[in-house]
């Protein structure tokens, strides 16, 4: 079996050299899915996984725009249309200086499985640019978004490819992108998700990823006879996902001890309650300030510059910042402090060695493709509402989100049960694979 996996990875690596993030994502899937494929005659010999790792289409383009100093700036834009076997391409747009082909291909590949797990008819895709919205004025961001969409619009559509937000792309950017698409196409369609409520958006969509992480993690804990009530919770990040995860953790009776950004993390021993979280939302969403500004209002808290929050003793850890933020040494700290569960809010935030450390020590571990699927799930619900020309209530959407996250958890149990342990990585990968693989077989070699 190891030989088959190594041969497969060698072939994929040959075609995707110098793409470490993409190869990391492919390796994780291959190690759990290939043993399953070998046992199933219907899949064996069809090269389905090899077809999955090859994007159906890679789009790269120049994005030229003019800053406030009337200087011309040039960025690079991408859209990876990875797999459309079960529906139109669906996945976010990321605006960040680190964006490159490897990162977007890893995200698009993960998106195939994540979207499949929701059971909604959505294929996998991802896109973005190396543009950095931090420090830019609203006018500069608008000019960039308009230039970006002027090329992207010809590749997307409500039945072809439906982008959404990601790191660096929030409601402001989605608004500018949608406005330019509408201007170019002269039509009002659900071509983007994450829209404002007054112009085609869905209630709960901004909160969905963060809420979903906690709903999924709660299901894991309940399966072990546990829950968030009375638990100390460490969260990384302070963006949309982290904020919304902290909100639900608090409602469920947990105590949120930390939040972070790229400058470091804050530790509030007494807990970041709803009032304190509201202040953080003001700092990050409106003032776009660094997390350490929190201490001006709450001086009893501590700020640790250029450090990660995993050194704080906790019961539950929710990495909600970015890929590979939780390394092997961080995992060792969680093990040392008797952490019982790690639920991923970000995409691939844990390194392979960290995942191994956690699972070897029987710590419940929820891979992002399962635990953070809430965002794309409600994106799918937003698409449905756009098609119906009808809006569901907040309670209706939240109930549907809880149901979807519960179904994803059950799928992970169905495919990931081992002796006295649930391998959620294996369960999520195989459950996501089966639906897409069956569709690909039915549609022939295309």
Where are these regions (language model features)?
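Adenosine-phosphate binding glycine-rich loop
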Residues: 2-25, 220-221, 320, 335-446
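Structured beta-strand/loop patches that form or line metal/cofactor-binding pockets in enzymes
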Residues: 42-73
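Glycine/serine-rich phosphate-binding loop and adjoining beta1-alpha1 elements at the start
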Residues: 96, 115-229
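General beta-strand structural signal in soluble alpha/beta enzymes
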Residues: 106, 160-164, 187-192, 235, ...
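Glycine-rich phosphate/diphosphate-binding loop of Rossmann-like nucleotide-binding domains
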Residues: 193-196, 201-311
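Rossmann-like adenosine-cofactor binding region
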Residues: 264-365, 370
């Amino acid at each position: 079996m190891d030989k088959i996996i190594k041969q497969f990875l060698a072939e994929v690596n040959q075609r995707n050299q110098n793409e470490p993030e993409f190869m990391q994502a492919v390796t994780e899937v291959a190690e759990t899915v290939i043993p399953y494929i070998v046992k199933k005659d219907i899949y064996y010999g069809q090269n389905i996984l090899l077809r999955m790792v090859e994007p159906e289409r890679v789009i790269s383009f120049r994005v030229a725009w003019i800053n406030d100093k009337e200087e011309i700036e040039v960025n690079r834009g991408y859209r990876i249309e990875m797999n459309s076997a079960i529906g139109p391409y669906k996945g976010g747009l990321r605006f960040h200086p680190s964006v490159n082909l490897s990162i977007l291909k890893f995200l698009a590949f993960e998106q195939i499985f994540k979207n499949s797990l929701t059971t909604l008819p959505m294929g996998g895709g991802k896109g973005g640019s190396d543009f950095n919205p931090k420090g830019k004025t609203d006018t500069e961001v608008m000019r960039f978004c308009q230039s970006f969409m002027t090329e992207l619009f010809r590749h997307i559509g409500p039945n072809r490819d439906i982008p959404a937000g990601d790191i660096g792309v929030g409601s402001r950017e989605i608004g500018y992108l949608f406005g330019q698409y509408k201007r170019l196409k002269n039509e009002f369609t659900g071509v983007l998700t994450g829209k404002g409520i007054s112009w085609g958006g869905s209630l709960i969509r901004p909160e969905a990823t963060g809420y979903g992480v906690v709903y999924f993690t709660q299901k894991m804990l309940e399966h072990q006879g546990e829950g968030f009530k009375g638990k100390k919770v460490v969260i990384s990040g302070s963006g949309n996902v982290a904020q919304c995860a902290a909100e639900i953790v608090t409602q469920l009776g947990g105590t949120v001890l930390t939040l972070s950004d790229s400058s470091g993390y804050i530790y509030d021993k007494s807990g970041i309650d709803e009032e304190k979280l509201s202040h953080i939302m003001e700092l990050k969403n409106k003032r776009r300030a660094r997390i350490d500004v929190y201490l001006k209002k709450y001086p009893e808290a501590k700020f640790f510059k250029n450090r990660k929050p995993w050194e704080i003793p906790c019961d539950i850890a929710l990495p909600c910042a970015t890929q590979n933020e939780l390394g092997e040494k961080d995992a060792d700290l969680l093990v040392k402090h008797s952490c019982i569960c790690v639920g991923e809010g970000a995409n691939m935030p844990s390194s392979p060695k960290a995942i191994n450390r956690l699972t070897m020590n029987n710590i419940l571990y929820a891979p992002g493709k399962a635990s953070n699927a809430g965002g794309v799930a409600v994106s799918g619900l937003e698409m449905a509402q756009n098609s119906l020309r009808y809006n569901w209530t907040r309670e209706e959407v939240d109930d549907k989100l809880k149901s979807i996250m519960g179904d994803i958890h059950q799928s992970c149990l169905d495919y990931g049960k081992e002796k006295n342990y649930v391998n959620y990585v294996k369960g999520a990968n195989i459950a996501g694979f089966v639906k897409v693989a069956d569709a690909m077989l039915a549609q022939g070699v295309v």
